[in-house]
């Protein structure tokens, strides 16, 4: 799990979720807010997704957040 700030000063957490068929989702939740966003990661497996998340800077997380869709 990673915490970061968006360009408006909002505080977010990003976490990984193993989905069906080997897919990995990046899940975003705003700290103190409601709703959850998700984005499928283009990684081969969960381990690779963990490495991506650990190595991503805040700019990469903000870019993924901008591409994320509401859950549900």
Where are these regions (language model features)?
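Intrinsically disordered, low-complexity regions enriched in Ser/Pro/Gly/Gln/His and often acidic
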Residues: 4-5, 21, 45, 64
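Acidic, low-complexity intrinsically disordered segments
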Residues: 34-72
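Residue-level signal for well-ordered alpha-helical segments
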Residues: 3-5, 30, 38, 42
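Negatively charged, low-complexity tracts enriched in Asp/Glu with abundant Ser/Thr
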Residues: 1-13
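Short, surface-exposed, low-complexity cationic segments
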Residues: 17-36
């Amino acid at each position: 799990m990673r915490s970061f700030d968006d360009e408006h000063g909002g505080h977010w957490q990003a976490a990984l979720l193993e989905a069906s068929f080997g897919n990995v989702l990046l899940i975003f939740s705003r700290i103190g807010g409601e709703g959850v966003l998700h984005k499928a990661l283009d990684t081969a497996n969960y381990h690779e997704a963990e490495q991506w998340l650990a190595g991503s800077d805040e700019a990469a997380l903000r870019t993924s957040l901008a591409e994320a869709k509401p859950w549900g």
